[in-house]
Structure formats: C-alpha cells, structure tokens
Amino acid sequence: MQLDSSIAAIVTGGASGLGEATARRLASHGVRVALFDLDEARGTRVAGDIGGLFCKTDVTSEASVADALKAARSRHGIERIAVNCAGIAPGKRIVLKNRETGALAPQDLASFSKVVSVNLIGTFNVLAQSAAGMAGLEPLDEDGSRGVIVNTASVAAEDGQVGQAAYAASKGAVKALTLPAARDLSQYGIRVVAILPGIFHTPMFDSIAEDFRKTLAAAVPFPQRLGRPDEYAHLVEFICRNGMLNGETIRLDGAIRMAPR
C-alpha cells in the first residue's frame, strides 16, 4: 500500500504515546488521519498539529466507535488503515494481603474485567467495525488489497510478570486474535498484523524517577535503552507498505525477555 493523501486511517489511543507517534508518521506521508481517544485536550491538539480529526471515543462501546467511524468517514472517506493503540496497564496481584491485618483477598473481578474490556474487547470492537467498512472498498491493486489492521499486543503476552495477570491475559488474547482474524478477513483483502512492543518511553514514564528508567533500560540487551514511540510508528508504516505481512505477530523489544518481576 502506498501512503499518500488518497489513504485514510484511524488510530485509537492516538492522543499520546505509540498512537500519537503513529498518527504523526502517517500524516507526514499525506495520509488523512482520525484519532480515536478519550483525552479530548491532547487529542484535539495532536489532530490540529497534523491536520487530522479528533473523535472522542470509548473503544469498549459499540455505539461510540460507530459514531467515531461515521464522523471520520464523513470527513476522510472509509479508512484503509486501522491501528489499535488504545489500552490500559494497571498492575494488581491475584491474591492481595492486607498489610495491617494480614487478611488475604482475591483480586476483584471488576478490575480484571476492565483491563480485558479495554485491551481485548476494545481492540476487537474497532477491528470488526473497521473491517466491515474496508470490505466494501474497491481493491487497491491486482492482489485485491483493501486495507490493513494493526493491533497492539505486548511482550507481556509471552513474558507476563507478577501483577500482570489481567494485562498479560488481555494482550495474549490480542496476539491470539491475529491469525484467525487475518484468515477470516482474507476473503476481503484485509490484512491483520499485531505488534508486541517491549519497554517504550511513553507519557506514563514521565513520572518515573530517572534512576528507575535507567534500570529498565539496562535490562534491554540492545539497544540498551527504552524504545522510542516513533520506532513503533516506523514498524506500522512498514507493515502498511509490505503487502505480504499478514497474520503475523512481531516483537519490537530490543531482544528483552521480561523477568518474573
């Protein structure tokens, strides 16, 4: 797929971090980008910077995603590219111990369900609704290509740490979704690929002490640093351009394998 002004894209979680970098990179090639996010202030600013559209969106809601797609398609046309970056990563142990009483209690189901709802259900919600639109487009080439969907899993899908049961389960499911989704959508010429990022310097790291950031960076074999959001965005661009990449999960992690804790 060539990236230019004839192509429309949506990026969830596009107001910051990996999503913002992806939106900016696609827009730099002329792609018409719509950002789906809950952060209205940041999303509006980024959209203004790139000449795109911001749509306040709850990815866990069918109606919210449908409304956002309607707005984006009204302005830019039906998207050929959908990138799912929206996600949350709270840590919580399965069994919690009260420090004062020593009483043991299980992790509440609501907190587990919320992570799965945003990271997995939200990803599928956008994937399915976007694919339904892409499927009706005219093919771009002799292969019959109509579009590409890039989902964001995590190295936690394979190397989940203590306190990451919900997060790792949700991202493991996103990874597992990749191949069957690619096979399912192949009849429409829609590719599906997942990226498994390692430790990236996103806004959530801004509040972390510099010494701890250095410790995290030292755990990465090479290059011995945190990933940069634009490196994720560069891979998204490569996936969009390379029509043979389909049904694959790609680790982007500097060869790190996460320790148990």
Where are these regions (language model features)?
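Conserved mid-core segment of classical short-chain dehydrogenase/reductases
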Residues: 89-113, 132, 136-142, 163-166, ...
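Residue(s) in the substrate-gating loop at a strand-loop-helix junction
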Residues: 154
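C-terminal substrate-recognition "lid" of short-chain dehydrogenase/reductases
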Residues: 228-252, 257
